[in-house]
């Protein structure tokens, strides 16, 4: 099938360049989106990936047949949201986020920076168009400078005014991704005492995959923090919408712990604020929110669902286990820079190191996300429900089961035959025992199929 329709996901379009996403797909996609947004203003940017840069001119040529196109250059996803909001009818960035270098893709948002769901809004209108020699020639000769708009200066101006300069010694791993452009300049001005690594753009990602969650991708930042005696380290993913943090000892802080730290600081400013957290997060998150006068709202996993919910309920902040942090202040989208600003504020106001804050908020042992490759997701989830029938059940996203001294969420992957488990308990022993129990149960059920 042309342009395998499996590339259309809930949150984006993503696939391997040259195999699942090629120039013909990019041109056809551009033309379909252009028709949908005929005579509208569309902002387009790209990350540093080789596939993104190769597909860009074909995508723009398709768009230009129907819509007015403006090119922002090589930018991060938060910068695309920032540039689109209130100024353009649609924003599109060619990116595959934290995936390996052979991938590319497309993320889209409307004029309020709310994500479009490709599987719901683009896949139904997608069709193949012929990539003629004249179209190829037009793409080859496309002068991007003729379409160029500068959205970086306004972005830099906003964050340099909003974020407090710090004398803390930090290390930053840019992972050779999109944040090596604007975000690097901002951090360079905010910190006099910063160590930058992997800080030049390279779509081959020579240092490591640009993923803030995989331990093998965090070795460089951990090493840099220890070697340079830094007070904290941060790492961006490939398109700059995730922020990973390590403390002065090189220990990684989970996304839900960071969510709790940031939420506490926000609630010092706005005590009755609504704060959203994804259902995988530790129960320390709602406990902290409620302790400091906030309203804790649980959400499905994923930026598409979280941003829509934030808009609907007018939430001040949202955080995910996956290191996405969203702020009403800038339009309900991700901002690693604002997240960092609040983390530094917590360290200053509490007069604590990051390791001390991590210890304070890491009250409950958490398994982290564990993946299981299974033959039948639905069958296994039903059997797990039966096994824990005496516990409280929620089905907001997969199944969440709440028992006396532990709870867990088991949900299917949208894109792979996987089940994802997150489990938390009141003590380490129970956590390990229950993870093992569920692992064995899933293995037994899968073997029976």
Curated annotation (Swiss-Prot):
GO MF term (any one): magnesium ion binding
Textual note on the cofactor: Binds 1 Mg(2+) ion per subunit.
CDD domains, per this entry? PMM_PGM (cd03089)
Give the required cofactors.
Mg(2+)
The protein's annotated catalytic reaction(s) are: alpha-D-mannose 1-phosphate = D-mannose 6-phosphate
* Biological process annotations from GO: carbohydrate metabolic process
Catalytic activity, EC: 5.4.2.8
Pathway info = Amino-acid biosynthesis
Which residues of this UniProt protein bind Mg(2+)?
Answer: 97, 237, 239, 241
**UniProt keyword terms in alphabetical order:** Isomerase, Magnesium, Metal-binding, Phosphoprotein
| UniProt keyword Phosphoprotein present | yes
UniProt cross-references to Pfam families, sorted A to Z: PGM_PMM_I (PF02878), PGM_PMM_II (PF02879), PGM_PMM_III (PF02880), PGM_PMM_IV (PF00408)
Question: What positions constitute the catalytic site?
Answer: 97
Family, according to the entry, reads as follows: Belongs to the phosphohexose mutase family.
UniProt cross-references to PANTHER family, sorted A to Z:
PHOSPHOMANNOMUTASE (PTHR43771:SF1)
- Role of this protein: Catalyzes the formation of mannose-1-P from mannose-6-P. Can also use glucose-6-P.
Indicate what this protein is called per its UniProt record: Phosphomannomutase
């Amino acid at each position: 099938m042309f342009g395998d329709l499996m590339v259309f996901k809930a949150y984006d379009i993503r696939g391997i360049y040259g195999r699942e996403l090629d120039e013909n797909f990019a041109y056809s996609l551009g033309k379909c989106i252009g028709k949908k947004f005929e005579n509208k203003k569309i902002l387009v940017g790209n990350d540093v990936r080789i596939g993104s840069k190769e597909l860009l001119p074909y995508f723009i040529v398709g768009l230009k047949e129907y819509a007015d196109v403006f090119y922002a250059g090589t930018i991060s996803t938060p910068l695309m949201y920032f540039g689109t909001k209130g100024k353009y009818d649609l924003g599109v960035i060619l990116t595959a986020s934290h995936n390996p270098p052979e991938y590319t893709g497309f993320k889209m948002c409307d004029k309020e920076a709310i994500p479009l769901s490709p599987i719901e809004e683009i896949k139904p209108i997608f069709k193949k168009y012929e990539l003629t020699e004249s179209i190829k020639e037009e793409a080859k000769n496309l002068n991007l400078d003729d379409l160029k708009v500068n959205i970086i200066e306004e972005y830099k101006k906003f964050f340099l005014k909003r974020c407090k300069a710090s004398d803390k010694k930090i290390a930053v791993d840019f992972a050779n991704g999109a944040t090596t452009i604007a975000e690097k300049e901002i951090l360079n001005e905010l910190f006099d005492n910063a160590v930058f690594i992997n800080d030049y753009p390279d779509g081959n990602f020579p240092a490591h995959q640009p993923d803030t969650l995989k331990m093998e991708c965090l070795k460089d930042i951990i090493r840099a923090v220890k070697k340079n005696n830094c007070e904290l380290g941060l790492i961006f993913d490939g398109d700059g919408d995730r922020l990973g943090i390590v403390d002065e000892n090189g220990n990684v802080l989970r996304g839900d712990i960071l969510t709790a730290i940031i939420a506490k600081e926000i609630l010092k400013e706005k005590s009755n604020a609504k704060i959203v957290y994804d259902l995988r997060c530790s129960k320390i998150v709602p406990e902290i929110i409620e302790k400091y006068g906030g309203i804790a709202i649980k959400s499905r996993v994923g930026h598409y669902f979280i941003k829509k919910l934030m808009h609907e309920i007018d939430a001040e902040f949202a955080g995910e286990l996956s290191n996405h942090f969203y702020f009403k202040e800038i339009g309900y989208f991700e901002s690693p820079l604002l997240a960092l600003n609040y983390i530094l504020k917590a360290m200053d106001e509490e007069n604590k190191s990051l390791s001390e804050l991590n210890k304070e908020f890491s009250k409950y042992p958490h398994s982290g996300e564990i993946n299981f490759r299974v033959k039948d997701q639905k069958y296994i989830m039903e059997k797990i429900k039966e096994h824990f029938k005496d516990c409280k059940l929620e089905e907001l996203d997969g199944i969440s089961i709440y028992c006396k001294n532990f709870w867990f969420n088991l949900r299917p992957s949208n894109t792979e035959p996987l089940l994802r488990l997150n489990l938390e308990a009141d003590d380490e022993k129970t956590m390990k025992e229950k993870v093992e129990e569920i692992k064995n149960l899933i293995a037994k059920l899968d073997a029976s199929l």
